[in-house]
Amino acid sequence: MGLKSDKWIREQSIKNGMITPFCEENMGVGVVSYGLSSYGYDIRVADEFKIFTNVGGTVVDPKNFDEKNIVDFKGDVCIVPPNSFALARTIEYFKMPRDVLAICLGKSTYARCGIIVNVTPFEPGFEGHITIEISNTTPLPAKIYANEGIAQVLFLQGDEICEVSYADKKGKYQRQKGITLPRILEGDKK
């Protein structure tokens, strides 16, 4: 399994629409950097957020998620409360090749401020916006800047094509647009 370079990322994005919109240069003056880098792509966070709150007094349950747990926010700067959490999404829309898995790591600019970014792997065949999980681990409010970098994606090409892709198994987050809340597939339990 090999880590893919800027040349490969550019080719896949321009020819096959792997990343849309695609920023060919790494933009970084006066902003949290984003765009193409040597061996990855720095994704941007859109201007829509879902901020967790305890106003509803409910328990967070991934199998039965209650939207009373969140407050919707749209704007250029999102303030994540102390020791709290927010969901966001990428500006970029991804179409993953069948033989490529992507992993995403938070940017050091935010990590050095106590802001942890988590994104689960982009599976082969996945298509959609990426939902981003943002944790403010500090006792202070934290700013997240919309339309700027939030994390870096690394692309790993498998030694062979997988037998079953995310698209083949009709993954529950396939073709997601916007911020997608937790989902549990209904049906027969095995």
UniProtKB/Swiss-Prot annotation:
Subunit structure: Homotrimer.
Catalytic reactions of this protein: dCTP + H2O + H(+) = dUTP + NH4(+)
Keyword Nucleotide-binding: yes
UniProt binding sites for dCTP: 107-112, 152, 166, 176
Gene3D superfamilies named in the record: 2.70.40.10
Stated family: Belongs to the dCTP deaminase family.
Organism field: Campylobacter hominis (strain ATCC BAA-381 / DSM 21671 / CCUG 45161 / LMG 19568 / NCTC 13146 / CH001A)
Protein name in the entry: dCTP deaminase
Gene name of the record: dcd
Residues annotated as the enzyme's active site: 133
Keywords linked to the UniProt accession: Hydrolase, Nucleotide metabolism, Nucleotide-binding
